[in-house]
Amino acid sequence: MKINPTTSVPGVSTLEKENLGRISQIIGPVLDVAFPPGKMPNIYNALVVKGQDTAGQQINVTCEVQQLLGNNRVRAVAMSATDGLTRGMEVIDTGTALSVPVGGATLGRIFNVLGEPVDNLGPVDTRTTSPIHKSAPAFIQLDTKLSIFETGIKVVDLLAPYRRGGKIGLFGGAGVGKTVLIMELINNIAKAHGGVSVFGGVGERTREGNDLYMEMKESGVINEQNLAESKVALVYGQMNEPPGARMRVGLTALTMAEYFRDVNEQDVLLFIDNIFRFVQAGSEVSALLGRMPSAVGYQPTLSTEMGTLQERITSTKEGSITSIQAVYVPADDLTDPAPATTFAHLDATTVLSRGLAAKGIYPAVDPLDSTSTMLQPRIVGEEHYETAQRVKQTLQRYNELQDIIAILGLDELSEEDRLTVARARKIERFLSQPFFVAEVFTGSPGKYVGLAETIRGFKLILSGELDGLPEQAFYLVGNIDEATAKATNLEMESKLKK
């Protein structure tokens, strides 16, 4: 049987000879479908229900086969609302898994789980599609070299460097700058690495998805005039969608990222916001399919589902997918099975701090809480490792002295501690940086700081060479030369005022 892609239902191929079944049971988003003997669809096949509801409205629902029940029946999970479906309706077996558009045509566009554009900008070129279910790259295809993925953001590159082809957890509450950090990373990978990004919105608020899209257009990450010049493709399966869509939208985004890596041989950034919602959707589907729940009501297949997704995110000889995943921690309980399973896959964590955001230090990355497995002398080199450790020690000592300063004041500290505090405050400010994507809001041009420049700057602060400069000279600058130039300007300004 020949498969010919169709444009009627993006993301699904139809067969010239249709294999028809009928709905025998509907329980929420789960359908049981009876097929003729010997015509059973395979697991993960896409089924399409077309017809009219009782009000005469056209229905077009795509489902994915999850279980073969026996007696020629299969159980499938719907990718959209099942309102209006009735028993006895015809179901078409497409004979293949869900497939979505991939390649340059996806840039600057917003898709749903089926690969259908939802941004009202017309159809997408569906000549190149790819199934969302694939096996992870084989061992021989993997690139095992440990290399740093330079982001151009000082605090990240120095204290919690990302691994090329690694997975990073992004922790932070509302309003501490997650979105701006994400957009800056998208911008920097495009400029410094010639790479592209894919953003998977998994089970988050529709408003946030809309805000992100608008901000991307405003900051130039998405180019409305010429979509091909955009740096990102967006895939959304929001909170209000059925669990099937939320469970699979991460795979849709990953499939688009894999094409850029394997065929275009690019470095790709894959954002998943939020990985917890992927687990949550899997838990809902698992219960609907009648599986026995495991700890805290999660699905028994939790580790398998997480592993299947995460193992496809890796570096191969062709290119890399570096993934940044926002992690929601339910009730701040890090031992909850969902975040605990996620942590096992992470190479680095970037923790955003409300305290730093309140001080106006952006990016508000917590230098002491953020960690990385890459921060080892044999990987990053002795100079980088030593500088990072000394920066952390200085900041840690400053934290310990905060209580004494609050009660007794700075004058009660020893000479050595006062020097530590002065340097720590300079370091804290030097960890801030103007972003390219924030130019439109702040008016100050963004800065990309290379790793060597970052290390040089912090070494100079730690050595005491810059002790005479005022701490505000280090705030929102790029490299250390800009800080010294800013100090000279501040000095001249103060003289003029006098």
Swiss-Prot record:
Pfam families: ATP-synt_ab, ATP-synt_ab_N, ATP-synt_VA_C
Record has Membrane as a keyword: yes
Binding positions for ATP per the UniProt entry: G172, G173, A174, G175, V176, G177, K178, T179
Disulfide bonds: none
Keyword terms of this UniProt record: ATP synthesis, ATP-binding, CF(1), Chloroplast, Hydrogen ion transport, Ion transport, Membrane, Nucleotide-binding, Plastid, Thylakoid, Translocase, Transport
GO molecular function, one term: ATP hydrolysis activity
InterPro entries: AAA+_ATPase, ATP-synt_VA_C, ATP_synth_F1_bsu, ATPase_a/bsu_AS, ATPase_alpha/beta_chains, ATPase_F1/V1/A1_a/bsu_N, ATPase_F1/V1/A1_a/bsu_N_sf, ATPase_F1/V1/A1_a/bsu_nucl-bd
Bilayer topology: Peripheral membrane protein
Subcellular location: Plastid, Chloroplast thylakoid membrane
GO cellular component labels: chloroplast thylakoid membrane; mitochondrion; proton-transporting ATP synthase complex
Protein's GO biological process: proton motive force-driven mitochondrial ATP synthesis
UniProt EC number: 7.1.2.2
Catalytic activity: ATP + H2O + 4 H(+)(in) = ADP + phosphate + 5 H(+)(out)
Keyword Ribonucleoprotein on entry: no
SMART domains: AAA (SM00382)
Enzyme type, top EC level: translocase
Gene3D superfamilies found in the cross-reference section: 2.40.10.170, Bovine Mitochondrial F1-atpase, Atp Synthase Beta Chain, Chain D, domain 3, P-loop containing nucleotide triphosphate hydrolases
SUPFAM superfamilies referenced in this protein's UniProt entry, alphabetically: C-terminal domain of alpha and beta subunits of F1 ATP synthase (SSF47917), N-terminal domain of alpha and beta subunits of F1 ATP synthase (SSF50615), P-loop containing nucleoside triphosphate hydrolases (SSF52540)
Subunit structure: F-type ATPases have 2 components, CF(1) - the catalytic core - and CF(0) - the membrane proton channel. CF(1) has five subunits: alpha(3), beta(3), gamma(1), delta(1), epsilon(1). CF(0) has four main subunits: a(1), b(1), b'(1) and c(9-12).
Task of the protein: Produces ATP from ADP in the presence of a proton gradient across the membrane. The catalytic sites are hosted primarily by the beta subunits.
Family statement drawn from the similarity comment of this UniProt entry: Belongs to the ATPase alpha/beta chains family.
HAMAP family (UniProt xref): ATP_synth_beta_bact
Name of the molecule in the record: ATP synthase subunit beta, chloroplastic
Gene designation: atpB
